[in-house]
Amino acid sequence: VLANTLPGYYGLAEGSWKHWCRVWDVDFDWIKSRFKDEKYMSKPGFTLSRWYEGVIQEDKISQYTPLKAVVFWGCSSNSQSQYHKLKKALDKLDLVVIIDPFPTMTAAACDKDNVYLLPSSSQYETSGSVTSTQRSLQWRYRVVKPVHESKDDYEIMRLFTEKFGFADKFYKNIKQIPEDITREINKGTLTIGYNGQTPERIKKHTDYWHTFDVDTLIAKGGPCDGEYHGLPWPCWTTEHPGTPILYDISKPVAEGGLPFRARFGTEYTYPGKPKESILAADGVYNPGSEVKGGYPEFSDVVPGTNWKTDLSQETIKTAIKRGMAPFGNARARCYVWEYPDKIPVHREPLHSPDKEMIAKYPTFEDKPDHYRVYTKFKSEQKPEWVDEYPIILTSGRLVEYMGGGAETRSNKYLAELQPEMFAEVNVKMANDYGLRDGDLIWIESPHGGKIKVKTKISERVDAKTIFLPFHFGGFFMGDTWAGKYPEGTTPYALGEAANVVTNYGYDIVTQMQETKTGLCRIKKA
């Protein structure tokens, strides 16, 4: 979930809101009236990594009121860094709602009233389209109806809209069925070419997956002949085969080829240089293109629209007929003029073990109103951190578990393979601290978080580093929360959440949390 854009990467500008209002067939002024102030329509919201600051306000927030409620819908709160601060936020909120097939660590974390668990069905109890990170789609068929007290996501959303009084607008032109929802996505998400993957086409690909070549992804014969498996976006029309590779000028656009997108205008003046074209050079184009070189994005085929906002999709169809990409043909951009660093520059982590590197490669200035919260960079990067916290801390995944582990740690077979939380410690570090394999240790962060975990001695980490898997939950700073789960739902595998001790640190552009480098100290428990 992105805090700075409407669906389909449309952003938050007025034109973007009006586009989606046309898709939904709702009045723009009604949408605007839902906001306390019009300025919040175009203001990025809190991100997943720092929403809790909107509650506890340890760093200054940039909105008229603190957050009062939170809904976790298939989201593991223990996947977020600074978890001990997130817990403070949970206990301060007026309302916490958890929608999940399993009671997550969030349910156990709340020491307050007004916490509601809404059991949702699993992927086997519902149907609909799903998209992979490879951009291909498939249709998920329901195996059984939702069991016990669970409801599928569609039903939960319907109940929400009815409770909040806008079901008539939410379902104005669609029914509460996945096929209609997919068609609405087809209609509105033109920016990335989601318009050609109709429910009927996706189902056909799922039903005839055996006709696709595993190497080329192309169907050989059958009803999907010549199409790429899953119709990877952009899939420009209902006749388009999908785009397996985003940049490929060896084949026509109509057959799955694409140039680079002309997303950043047609000209730019680089520092110390004259203005130059940033469209593709002459002679760089897809086979069959009417223009034998660069060209801008298509607009005004239908007056007053462009390829991203023309709901008739005539603009896209016209571009394809001319052998051209709707979004234009430009050069790859390696100089990103909107970013603080226009080209990649090394900046030392906020919590670095190397004082000389901090001096040589300092971080950014602090950033006020960074997704509605003041974010520290320079003021947080102190060379003296390493004097008290000399060990490098990193975290990552285990093959047996996924995300915060609520589902996978509730599987007894997976829990048997990885039953306990641990800290992976190098042999030399273990000997220096007098540790043996299986010893309990305390790990403390510079920000007040601490966890108690078992030592796993290994040569896979170096003598300066500790590794923590981030999937565990059910313990908090030495205390068990096993008894705080609803009866009969405690996961088989419990452990401290690594993100209690992951350090403060966020990306300057996206506000993604820093989980791969930080500092800590350890002592034998």
Which ranges hold each PLM region?
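Extended redox/cofactor-interaction regions of prokaryotic respiratory oxidoreductases
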Residues: 1-114, 121-129, 203-433
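Hydrophobic transmembrane alpha-helix bundles
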Residues: 22, 26-28, 135-146, 204-222, ...
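Hydrophobic alpha-helical scaffolding
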Residues: 60, 75-76, 130, 142-150, ...
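Phosphate/diphosphate-binding loops
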Residues: 94-103, 143-161, 442-445
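Glycine/threonine-rich phosphate-binding loop and adjacent beta-strand/alpha-helix elements that clamp
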Residues: 116, 124-146, 161, 504
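Long, contiguous, secondary-structure-rich segments that constitute the structural scaffold
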Residues: 153-203, 290, 297-302, 306-326, ...
